[in-house]
Amino acid sequence: MDLNEKIINILSSVGLTKNLSIFILDLIPILIILLGATLGVLVIVWLERKISAAVQQRIGPEYAGPLGMIQALADGLKLVLKEDIIPAKGDPWLFSVGPALVVVPVFLSYLVVPFGHELILANLGVGILFWIALSSIAPLGLLMAGYGSNNKYSFLGGLRAAAQAISYEIPLALCVLSVALLSHSLSTVDIVEEQSKYGILGWNIWRQPIGFIAFLIASLAECERLPFDLPEAEEELVAGYQTEYCGIKFGLFYVGSYLNLLVSALFVSVLYLGGWNFSLPWINFPILLTENDFALSLNIVNATLGIAITLGKAYLFLFLSILARWTLPRVRMDQLLDLGWKFLLPVSLGNLLLTASLQLALL
């Protein structure tokens, strides 16, 4: 009897019908994504404020909870309670759909993020391409939001977001394809398993150093983080495509930005840093299939360690992105496009061709 059947039997024993039990079971992954990703955003916001304060020799959030840990929750509650205003001459449909089109694809990206061999919500054979496809939808929402606001700053911000996404989506996809060639699979689980054979020496960061650097730069640009935050440059565009937004719609953009940053960090961990595996080769807890208390306890420990290791590696990338915000100047729009088309695209394409040539030579 597998875990799903056990949960259905437990729900049926309390008086629920089998169909209702199956429906509730299908809702569990959705709740896991919503709660886990939201908690991750709260942690990232708190970390960014604390690290930013340390860089500037300040204290940062301190009074809202221990060490200011619930400051982000208070800010989110404030945005939810604010009035939702739609511009008088704007397009209400585009203005309202834009934020949802930004957040929903990012939430769906968490379906293919593995935290263990069996600890993944949807182990798709084309999982990595699924993420690339979803990440290309969000800029459409930004463009709709900018156009629907009937504001020149918002429209320019939306155009910048679309141009930036097109420029950096291609190098990002080419870097991902290079990793897929090495792993002989597009499944995120298979990519992590391929890196686990030789411990830390088997990580793709050593086999794909050029692709790793290109992936980091493209990821920062996709997340619109400094020095690539051209779509919402405060000195030039007030707040870019967010200028006319307030209340919960503005909060959706805010959450979507950090969700995208977190999922990018998780994919850095999965693609290049070995995912949930330990750094030492052949050291791992086995997944026991027997149904006794010891096996259950060991599987829980294994799953907990997998989640902790994956998040630890991901937060290393988050730390670097937060430091980059306060150490690097914002680039101009022409420099942004030149970096994407004239540098990252040739480098990532050359890296893909080199990887394919080496793989053919080893056949």
Curated annotation (Swiss-Prot):
Reaction it catalyzes: a plastoquinone + NADH + (n+1) H(+)(in) = a plastoquinol + NAD(+) + n H(+)(out); a plastoquinone + NADPH + (n+1) H(+)(in) = a plastoquinol + NADP(+) + n H(+)(out)
Gene Ontology CC annotations of this record: chloroplast thylakoid membrane
Q: Which Pfam families match?
A: NADHdh
InterPro entries according to UniProt = NADH_UbQ_OxRdtase_su1/FPO, NADH_UbQ_OxRdtase_su1_CS
Keyword NAD belongs to the record: yes
Transmembrane regions listed in the UniProt entry: 27-47, 93-113, 124-144, 162-182, 200-220, 250-270, 303-323, 343-363
Paired cysteines (S-S): none
Origin superkingdom: Eukaryota
Q: Which UniProt keywords apply?
A: Chloroplast, Membrane, NAD, NADP, Plastid, Plastoquinone, Quinone, Thylakoid, Translocase, Transmembrane, Transmembrane helix
Record-linked PROSITE patterns:
COMPLEX1_ND1_1 (PS00667), COMPLEX1_ND1_2 (PS00668)
Task: Write down the top EC class of this protein.
Answer: translocase
Please report the record's description of how this protein sits within the membrane: Multi-pass membrane protein
| Keyword field contains Transmembrane helix | yes
EC number(s): the record gives 7.1.1.-
Name any one GO molecular function: quinone binding
Give the protein family.
Belongs to the complex I subunit 1 family.
Q: Which HAMAP family match?
A: NDH1_NuoH (MF_01350)
| Job of this protein | NDH shuttles electrons from NAD(P)H:plastoquinone, via FMN and iron-sulfur (Fe-S) centers, to quinones in the photosynthetic chain and possibly in a chloroplast respiratory chain. The immediate electron acceptor for the enzyme in this species is believed to be plastoquinone. Couples the redox reaction to proton translocation, and thus conserves the redox energy in a proton gradient.
- Partners and quaternary state? NDH is composed of at least 16 different subunits, 5 of which are encoded in the nucleus.
What protein am I looking at? NAD(P)H-quinone oxidoreductase subunit 1, chloroplastic
The organism is Chaetosphaeridium globosum (Charophycean green alga)
Phylogenetic lineage: Eukaryota, Viridiplantae, Streptophyta, Coleochaetophyceae, Coleochaetales
